[in-house]
Amino acid sequence: MPSERQKYIRNFCIIAHIDHGKSTLADRLLEKTGVLTSREMQEQVLDNMELERERGITIKAQAVRMVYKASDGHEYIYNLIDTPGHVDFNYEVSRSLAACEGAILVVDAAQGIEAQTLANVYLALEHNLEIMPVINKIDLPSAQPEVVKKEIEDVIGLDASQAPMISAKNGLNIEEVLEKIVDMIPCPEADEKAPLRALIFDSFYDSYKGVIVYIRVKEGTLKTGDTIRLMYTKKEFLVTELGYLKPGGLSPADELKAGDVGYIAASIKNVRDTRVGDTITLVENPAKEPLPGYKKVNSMVFCGIYPADGSKYGDLRDALDRLQLNDAALTFEPESSVALGFGFRCGFLGLLHMEIIQERLEREYNFDLVTTAPSVIYRVTTTDGDVIEIDNPTNLPPVTEIDSMEEPMVKATIMVPTEYVGNIMDLSQERRGIYKDMSYIDEGRAMLTYEMPLNEIIYDFFDALKSRTKGYASFDYELVGYKESDLVKLDIMLNGEIVDALSFIVHREKSVARGRRMAEKLKESIPRQMFEIPIQACIGGKIIARETVKAFRKDVLSKCYGGDISRKRKLLEKQKEGKKRMRQVGSVEVPQEAFMSVLKLD
């Protein structure tokens, strides 16, 4: 049974596809409950990063506490936990959902259900959350709320007959949403006297207090001055401050009880000690079992990041260290490349995560960066029977020592208007996708399921998908495991020397076409020198493509007016000798544009 205090608490999150109005609805709820005055309002209050506002996406989970006086006369405490919507941050989403009892599902009245709406709904159902649908953007001329209601019922199986119809932008019917939360979202039920178990769903670094951890107390009570233990990392800390969350700040309190959402500060120095999903308990009266669902987040996509100016190496390390304070999913280790000098091999959750980190380095820390082609983790079985994981093509053992190679596979869900289904099938086959399933959501839209290699998605699959469907397709993927594949390492040689930063791993069927395109692209972007430069693509020792950047030539015959042919020949031979010598000692400068052009091959 919930205690008297718990009856008036509602913990919920808002889930939606990108651009369906999740952050705008959160803004309106804050305004209506008086947490913020309209003067303090700025768009997307919970998206703290400038980048989040600009791209219109939520990257870090946030939480806020509101007090709402309902029509039944009671005051309710609403804890809204804002979740990232993008597939890269899937684990963060699942932990945020685990901190709630219910979820508001926001669906755009003009667009209907999209791929990530579905992915997040399934996650919410796995956590047994009560889902409350809300139909947004009903003020748009193209809105079809009744059609969307039917879609919610058919595709997800939720009863949408009572769903509030709102316009978050204009603040229409927001009151109805606040009232519905009381009825539809269950209150927490937990024992305040049991041993403490609290779930970490986010953490960030504060330069004065150290790491501040966002928690949801599942059982028990936590007070200032308690000594806590993190059940997975086994670290112990003394709680110096705890309290509730409000936009743009913290409001300290004396204790947090079962059902509460709040924060704690405990002089923690490193974000890596407070892993998202870990369980906090008390040292004096520890819980027997941690909360279920914790897993260590592993990087999926890797790339080399190098400063364009080699002397900035130390600064780049500092910047990455700072970013890592708030982003435990970012990993990096030093690496050096013959072509690019010293830099770092960085690991990310996915493509969006990689782009965001690169953009933040360039924008917040003013770096000029050179990045290598993104790569995934391959599993290589050697002829001795050892299994090694490779995230950098330059570390691949010689062909003679490899018995087999496996690559990570994903299950891709693509939602698309029916007239583009053919285009998507072509694209998926080009990317070595294996067709699994297809179903129709309504007359105009289909849902396709494919199994694909992650390697084929990380380059520019998303761009290709959008361009072939005029921007209408939406896409979501999840990892399904590893699969053996015929993969080879493609090397690029300039002037007879391998450029390590341009090597990558590719499927054998595609290797020749890829090698040719790379050679052509490089020929366009490498400036001419005084000697000719052969550009060769090779697999093992076999050359599969070649292009030549022609040399500049001085006209050595300009002084010869007529005269003997052998005199001219002597001068030309002499020039040829000089070019040959130059070629032996000359090194080729590869401009940054050349690296970038090779990444954008298709």
Swiss-Prot record:
Substrates-to-products reaction catalysed: GTP + H2O = GDP + phosphate + H(+)
Subcellular location as annotated: Cell membrane
InterPro entries in the cross-refs: EF-4, EFG_III/V, EFG_V-like, EFTu-like_2, G_TR_CS, LepA_C_sf, LepA_CTD, LepA_IV
Protein's UniProt keywords contain rRNA-binding: no
Keywords noted in UniProt: Cell membrane, GTP-binding, Hydrolase, Membrane, Nucleotide-binding, Protein biosynthesis
EC numbers on record: 3.6.5.n1
Residues where GTP binds: 19-24, 136-139
One Pfam family of this chain: LepA_C
Domain tr-type G as annotated: residue spans: 7-189
GO cellular component, one term: plasma membrane
Example GO biological process: positive regulation of translation
Keyword check for Iron: no
Main subcellular location of this protein, as a coarse class: membrane
Enzyme class: hydrolase
Chain ranges passing through the membrane: none
GO molecular function: GTP binding; GTPase activity; ribosome binding; translation elongation factor activity
Membrane topology note: Peripheral membrane protein
Family: Belongs to the TRAFAC class translation factor GTPase superfamily. Classic translation factor GTPase family. LepA subfamily.
Function, in words: Required for accurate and efficient protein synthesis under certain stress conditions. May act as a fidelity factor of the translation reaction, by catalyzing a one-codon backward translocation of tRNAs on improperly translocated ribosomes. Back-translocation proceeds from a post-translocation (POST) complex to a pre-translocation (PRE) complex, thus giving elongation factor G a second chance to translocate the tRNAs correctly. Binds to ribosomes in a GTP-dependent manner.
Name of the protein in question: Elongation factor 4
Lineage per the UniProt record: Bacteria, Bacillati, Bacillota, Clostridia, Eubacteriales
